[in-house]
């Protein structure tokens, strides 16, 4: 099963367009993180308490991720970072690591193939590389890794359709990867 964690603010924006081009003809679950609520992260590493409940949408999303074979993080580049909604979701991994119901969290994440789609407007193929590193390092902490990434260039609506490199790569991903 493929799960897309979409962190963009426009449902049909450039990031969504590029990601859907990759997935054309494949079955997938699209989770729009901007439509969900994530409470602030609770850091209990140095306390005697545990994470026993989530009073937001996080648990539903992480459970979906853990049932997936493939996960695609899809985000516009906002101020040289992934979107706040995607970052907030990733920050909650700290809670999952402290949740006794997810004792096998790292092992389960290691079995998933992760990919990243980014779209930005200010020299993104250079300036978005720290975003790639951010995701890669976060996954490495869990013993997982980023299998591939695609960075597209777009400033205005539908600009991504003029990024020949990104479109060709999206088509290649669509054929190459056994979604």
Report each predicted region and the residues it spans:
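N-terminal beta1-alpha1-beta2 submodule of the flavodoxin-like/Rossmannoid cofactor-binding fold
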Residues: 1-98, 103, 165-179
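Short, solvent-exposed coil/turn elements at secondary-structure transition points
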Residues: 34-36, 120, 152-155
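Glycine-rich phosphate/pyrophosphate-binding loop and the adjoining helix
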Residues: 20-26, 133-179
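Short histidine/acidic/glycine/proline-rich micro-motifs that form metal-
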Residues: 9-12, 77-80, 121-125, 155-158
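Short, basic/glycine-rich phosphate-binding loops at helix/coil junctions
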Residues: 39-44, 114-116, 150-151
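Hydrophobic/aromatic beta-strand patches that form the interior of the parallel beta-sheet core
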Residues: 3-5, 29-31, 115-118, 147-150
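Short, well-ordered secondary-structure micro-motifs
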Residues: 41-42, 127, 159-161
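Short, glycine-/small-residue-rich phosphate/pyrophosphate-handling segment
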Residues: 102-147
């Amino acid at each position: 099963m493929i799960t897309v964690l979409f962190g963009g603010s426009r449902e049909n924006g450039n990031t969504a367009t590029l990601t859907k081009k990759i997935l054309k003809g494949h079955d997938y679950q699209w989770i729009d993180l901007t439509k969900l609520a994530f409470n602030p992260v609770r850091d209990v590493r140095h306390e005697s308490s545990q994470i026993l409940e989530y009073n937001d949408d996080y648990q539903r999303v992480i459970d979906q991720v853990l049932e997936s074979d493939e996960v695609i993080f899809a985000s516009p580049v906002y101020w040289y970072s992934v979107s706040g909604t995607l970052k907030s979701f990733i920050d909650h991994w700290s809670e999952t690591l402290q949740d006794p119901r997810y004792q096998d969290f790292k092992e389960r994440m290691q079995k998933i193939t992760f990919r990243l789609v980014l779209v930005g407007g200010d020299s993104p193929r250079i300036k978005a590389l720290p975003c790639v590193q951010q995701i890669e390092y976060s996954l490495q902490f869990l013993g997982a890794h980023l299998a591939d990434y695609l960075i597209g260039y777009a400033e205005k609506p539908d600009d991504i359709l003029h990024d020949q490199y990104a479109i060709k790569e999206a088509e290649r991903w669509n054929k190459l990867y056994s979604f």
